[in-house]
Amino acid sequence: MSTKVVNVAVIGAGVVGSAFLDQLLAMKSTITYNLVLLAEAERSLISKDFSPLNVGSDWKAALAASTTKTLPLDDLIAHLKTSPKPVILVDNTSSAYIAGFYTKFVENGISIATPNKKAFSSDLATWKALFSNKPTNGFVYHEATVGAGLPIISFLREIIQTGDEVEKIEGIFSGTLSYIFNEFSTSQANDVKFSDVVKVAKKLGYTEPDPRDDLNGLDVARKVTIVGRISGVEVESPTSFPVQSLIPKPLESVKSADEFLEKLSDYDKDLTQLKKEAATENKVLRFIGKVDVATKSVSVGIEKYDYSHPFASLKGSDNVISIKTKRYTNPVVIQGAGAGAAVTAAGVLGDVIKIAQRL
């Protein structure tokens, strides 16, 4: 029976954060995971002496009733540094501000598990600082930044550690854009309009509150930046390579999401034409992120695929990533749910377990 104890500090109790906490508190393990901090923007639960917070499954009520203000991040680092046991910080937010403190956490020996893409897809200097592997640094795991709980990042890191070399990666990295193109461009002829599919996707909750945040391609660009960097391409930033936006120029600046959706149908013509051209070649349209390690090139945009291609037969909002390496000349294909609270939280919890095993 292991006597290993790790202290877990959690920031964010939203949709993913809630699923993570429920999974963490229900988990059975030979390692003891003590929840010592639970923080939201304004209020928090904090154990000053690092004894486990006695909240159990009632953590929501305990947090809602708390009158303790959330510590500024510098103060939080100073507090966690004094922990007698190793600390894992779990950031379940998408905050760029919190991500900006990751290097400080890590340099103070605090490990990080997170689905937050911001730090890993920002400037290259931050990436290098986070993975400098200084012996006193905390560990950094971010499986859920690409493909939610799918084992994409862990697979890439593992094969590279064993001496394999990534040659090409291409894939459908966005659950939202997967759904939209799977409905819009099919092997069976259809008259579905792009604008109508976007409206349905929003109704079903697949898109961000403002669908332009999906259609601008930046979310895919961030994910491609991450897998590109892992594969050895020094991608400067998500805006340093070609990213095709699906937002018609005149609609980029309209004030509201409702106005955008209302006017989107005025611009269906170009994508309808592209769909028809693809159909005459027995192909479908998909929104793809690509990395070519040999040419150090990265891109995001619409591509055509034969009806027989794995990307063409995709259903729903699945992600699918194809990875070609020196050893895997026939590409490895990883497919499954690339979004959703439960699978994302499981990806984060898996990272917490991996870190704990190394501490």
Curated annotation (Swiss-Prot):
Cross-referenced InterPro entries: Asp/hSer_DH_NAD-bd (IPR005106), Bifunc_Aspkin/hSer_DH (IPR011147), HDH_cat (IPR001342), HDH_CS (IPR019811), HDH_short (IPR022697), NAD(P)-bd_dom_sf (IPR036291)
Binding site for NADPH: 16, 60, 93-94, 117, 340
UniProt KW keywords: Amino-acid biosynthesis, Isopeptide bond, Methionine biosynthesis, NADP, Oxidoreductase, Threonine biosynthesis, Ubl conjugation
Stored Pfam families: Homoserine_dh, NAD_binding_3
Protein role: Catalyzes the conversion of L-aspartate-beta-semialdehyde (L-Asa) to L-homoserine (L-Hse), the third step in the biosynthesis of amino acids that derive from aspartate (the aspartate family of amino acids), including methioinine and threonine, the latter of which is a precursor to isoleucine; production of homoserine leads to a branch-point in the pathway as it can either be O-phosphorylated for processing to threonine, or O-acylated for processing to methionine.
Family: Belongs to the homoserine dehydrogenase family.
Cross-link (Glycyl lysine isopeptide (Lys-Gly) (interchain with G-Cter in ubiquitin)): 290
Annotated positions binding L-homoserine: 208, 219
Impact noted for substituting residue 219 to L: Reduces kcat 150-fold
Cofactors that this protein relies on: a metal cation
GO cellular component, one term: nucleus
PANTHER family for this protein: HOMOSERINE DEHYDROGENASE (PTHR43070:SF5), PTHR43070
Self-association state and partner proteins as the record states: Homodimer.
Domain of life: Eukaryota
Annotated EC: 1.1.1.3
Active site: 223
Note: Present with 48900 molecules/cell in log phase SD medium.
Annotated Na(+) binding sites: 143, 146, 148, 150
Reactions listed under catalytic activity: L-homoserine + NADP(+) = L-aspartate 4-semialdehyde + NADPH + H(+); L-homoserine + NAD(+) = L-aspartate 4-semialdehyde + NADH + H(+)
Phenotypic consequence of residue 208 to D: Increases KM for aspartate-semialdehyde 48-fold and reduces kcat by 50%
Residues the record lists as binding NADP(+): 16, 93, 117, 205, 208, 340
The protein, known as: Homoserine dehydrogenase
Disulfide bond positions: none
pH-activity note: Optimum pH is 7.5 in the forward direction. Optimum pH is 9.5 in the reverse direction.
